Curated annotation (Swiss-Prot):
Cellular component GO terms, alphabetical: cytoplasm; cytosol; mitochondrion
This protein's name: Histidine--tRNA ligase, cytoplasmic
Catalytic activity: tRNA(His) + L-histidine + ATP = L-histidyl-tRNA(His) + AMP + diphosphate + H(+)
Role according to the record: Catalyzes the ATP-dependent ligation of histidine to the 3'-end of its cognate tRNA, via the formation of an aminoacyl-adenylate intermediate (His-AMP). Plays a role in axon guidance.
Gene name for this UniProt entry: hars1
Location of this chain's protein in the cell: Cytoplasm
Length: 519
């Protein structure tokens, strides 16, 4: 019965897609076309699993759940973003490493708290229990411990895997890239931490995604706050994971989880509620250092003192306008030991998306993309892998690249600007027939000189077709060969945008192309 129902729904969706879209949008004003497509895809997938109209299993050619393909335009956008990020990392003196895409399961176990359930385990093929890497931080710590490295400034860009419930319209996937920057070593307090925040500020500013905020807190402040509010020691991590949901859920829902699901007393939850509503800057840190309750925790006082120092360095880095001290920031990963931070877009210049937990239409106030960068200090992680427990202090940041890609793609779709998918500088074209050999000789000269060039794979292509290809692909120059040009020892160089043409001697052609394309 279910199979018949799903098949009927899918056939309606497939046969009347436009009408269905229109009905859905009119009936649910908060729903986007992308979300409708996502739901339709799920129904079609279910229909295929249950069987087609004849009851037989049908194979659906598709990507795995939570993954996607990228077309040339999307890859051009991604490459631009990657180049911006790598350029920033290198500007700050980082070197790069790489680690295996899968690790021993034991390497990853116990490092992520409640998020450990999202780790992908692999079937045992050779006596080792393996898991796909969940992030790039734990493999980095393992790398430091294995190689006995005590200081390094490194960046790493690679794919990670999470068995999460994907929301692909909001840039959440099961396979995605992370771009990490970390500083390992024993240094004076808060200097490396401040540089990590400076890097986040630089990258988000250069990508021009719109306005953003960087929230900072400290795990020692959180633990001290939990202690003075009456949270039992053995509940610190689980309550921290619940507080971490405040960026997605209202306080009442978070409190309900603390009290009714995790067994925290209502009094303790109410006291936590007072603190997690606080935001500010250095002034808030100074105020909390005078708070009678907070002063009872030496941990919290140490964290607050470091927050003050951090803000003094951030002032020198000229980034305090975007940074806010937010006591609700928790970051649920177990390995953080000190400063933590997270960057969110405040949506200026970003297309509205429907709220995740409401049936209301999106508004400027409720629009959110989620975190686009996050990180913190993890001084104990390397010691977990060292046989003698030797610690290497570390601090780092991870850029949430997939969400940034989603925003950049939205902006590109809304823009009239043409996206180039190749870097070809010049097209080698022929004005008459039977000039293939001459075109091949010329393009070989250009390639040997390091010029990016291409030609049409026809013996006698029409000149108009060659010029149209240049306009469609954004190729700026055309080197045109004809019988007269060959006789005179010149090449006609055409500017595709202005359509101006000039004869250039064969000997000067390479220098002229390089001069015109050097900007």
């Amino acid at each position: 019965m279910l199979a018949m129902h799903c098949a009927r729904v899918c056939s309606v969706l497939m046969g009347c897609r436009t009408t269905t879209r229109a009905l859905s949008i009119r009936s649910f004003p908060g729903v986007t076309l992308a979300q409708i497509d996502e739901e339709v895809a799920k129904l079609l997938e279910l229909k295929a699993h249950l069987g087609g109209d004849d009851g037989k299993h049908q194979f659906v050619l598709k990507t795995a759940k939570g993954t996607r393909d990228y077309n040339p335009k999307q890859m051009a956008i991604r490459e631009k973003v990657f180049n911006t990020i790598v350029s920033c990392f290198k500007r700050h003196g980082a070197e790069t490493i790489d680690t295996p895409v899968f690790e021993l399961k034991e390497t990853l176990t116990g490092k992520y708290g409640e998020d450990s359930k999202l780790i992908y385990d692999l079937k045992d093929q050779g006596g080792e229990l393996l898991s796909l890497r969940y992030d790039l931080t734990v493999p980095f710590a393992r790398y430091l411990a294995m190689n006995k490295i005590t200081n390094i400034k490194r960046y790493h860009i690679a794919k990670v895997y999470r068995r999460d419930n994907p929301a692909m319209t909001r840039g959440r996937y099961r396979e995605f890239y992370q771009c990490d920057f970390d500083i390992a070593g024993q240094y004076d307090a808060m200097i490396p931490d401040a540089e990590c925040l400076k890097i986040v500020h630089e990258i988000l500013s250069e990508l021009d995604l719109g306005d953003f905020r960087i929230k900072v807190n400290d795990r020692r402040i959180l633990d001290g706050m939990f202690a003075v509010c009456g949270v039992p020691d053995n509940m610190f991590r689980t309550i921290c994971s619940t507080v971490d949901k405040l960026d997605k859920l209202p306080w009442e829902a978070v409190k309900n989880e603390m009290v009714n699901e995790k067994g925290l007393s209502e009094e303790a939850a109410d006291q936590i509620g007072v603190y997690v509503g606080m935001q500010g800057g250095m002034d808030l840190a100074e105020r909390l250092l005078q708070d009678q309750k907070m002063c009872q925790s030496t941990q919290a006082c140490a964290g607050l003192t470091d927050i003050k120092l951090l803000f003094s360095y951030l002032q020198l880095f000229q980034v305090t306008d975007k940074v806010v001290f937010d006591l609700s920031l928790a970051r649920g990963l177990d390995y953080y030991t000190g400063i933590i931070y997270e960057a969110i877009l405040t949506q200026a210049g970003v297309a509205p998306v429907a709220p995740e937990t409401s049936n209301e239409a999106p508004t400027e106030e409720c629009v959110t993309v989620g975190s686009v960068a996050g990180g913190g200090r993890y001084d104990g992680l390397v010691g977990m892998f060292d046989p003698k427990g030797r610690k290497v202090p570390c601090v780092g940041v991870s850029i949430g690249i997939e969400r940034i890609f989603s925003i950049m793609e939205q902006k590109a779709e809304a823009s009239t600007e043409k996206i180039r998918t190749t870097e070809v500088q010049v097209m080698v074209a022929a004005a008459q027939k039977n000039l293939l050999e001459e075109r091949l000789r010329l393009i070989t000269e250009l390639w040997n000189a390091g010029i990016k060039a291409e030609l049409m794979y026809k013996k006698s292509p029409k000149l108009l077709s060659q010029l149209q290809h240049c306009e469609e692909s954004g190729i700026p120059l055309v080197a045109i060969l004809g019988e007269q040009e060959l006789k005179n020892g010149v090449v006609k160089l055409r500017n595709v945008a202005t359509r101006d043409e000039v004869d250039i001697s064969r000997a000067d052609l390479i220098a002229e192309i390089k001069k015109r394309t050097s900007a």
